Swiss-Prot record:
Its EC number is 2.7.1.23. It catalyses: NAD(+) + ATP = ADP + NADP(+) + H(+). It is found in: Cytoplasm. It comes from the Bacteria. The lineage of its organism: Bacteria, Bacillati, Cyanobacteriota, Cyanophyceae, Nostocales. Gene3D superfamilies: Probable inorganic polyphosphate/atp-NAD kinase, domain 1, Probable inorganic polyphosphate/atp-NAD kinase, domain 2. This is NAD kinase 2. Belongs to the NAD kinase family. The active site is at 78 (proton acceptor). Its cofactor is a divalent metal cation. Its main location: cytoplasm. Pfam families: NAD_kinase, NAD_kinase_C. GO terms for cellular component: cytoplasm. InterPro entries: ATP-NAD_kinase_N, ATP-NAD_kinase_PpnK-typ_C, NAD/diacylglycerol_kinase_sf, NADK.
Amino acid sequence: MPKVGIIYNDIKPVAGRVAIELKDKLTAAGWDVSITSSIGGILGYSNPESPVCHTPIDGLTPPGFDSEMKFAIVLGGDGTVLAASRQVAPCGIPILAINTGHMGFLTETYLNQLPQAIDQAIAGEYEIEERAMLTVKVLRGESVLWEALCLNEMVLHREPLTSMCHFEIAVGRHAPVDIAADGVIVSTPTGSTAYSLSAGGPVVAPGVPVLQLVPICPHSLASRALVFPDTEPVNIYPVNIPRLVMVVDGNGGCYIFPEDRVYLERSPYSVKFIRLQPPEFFRILREKLGWGLPHIAKPTSVELP
């Protein structure tokens, strides 16, 4: 009996309703269906009383999800896809992401096209697009305090009402550099269209094997976004702040103290996205972010000669 998974956003009633309906339909068609919510992929935040919230990378896979599963249907928005990625990437399960959220930059299709999408996926009429992930670790000495898989980005920044941060950052075996800024972002190509883009980083096509380091509000004109090979690990040391905040993929993180370091490297795991049509990254940029649209003059209240 073929296996399929369903991961849904349990905060959205429509996603939960569709998940149950889809489970019944696939079960009746002879599929072994495992269903879970994306809450299992949410990392959670630590608090000052408990500064470390440890989430083992291999501990997020839901019961019933394994490498024998043909694919997993994800019902939600981009946040749900980010959480689901951590749940299934260690098993190599492909994701068919159905948008029930807002922008849906990472999703493949919309809810009103769900029946056709399921039929096409069951028939095997799709391509697989792999997206690189990061392994993020917080180390104190050689002890791992916290670790997580990351599809978009890791952000390390100051707390509100605190002064500017200094970071000592070493990329690979290159000489460390000092960056003065409100924070720093290390992102994958997938994350280049998220927080990194808003902070002034470049857009990187998904298949390019690079990472990027983007300062947040740097205190120097010389501190600009850096793109480097994803074979280079990154070590980040806080220099002058009692405590920093680290956030991974916008949905979890922990506090970083002066005695800690943040270590990042390309993960051996990747996310496998089911593409029902040949992937067209520039088309998605155009549709979702308005990239490359022709400039249209805005109407003016002044009549020009």
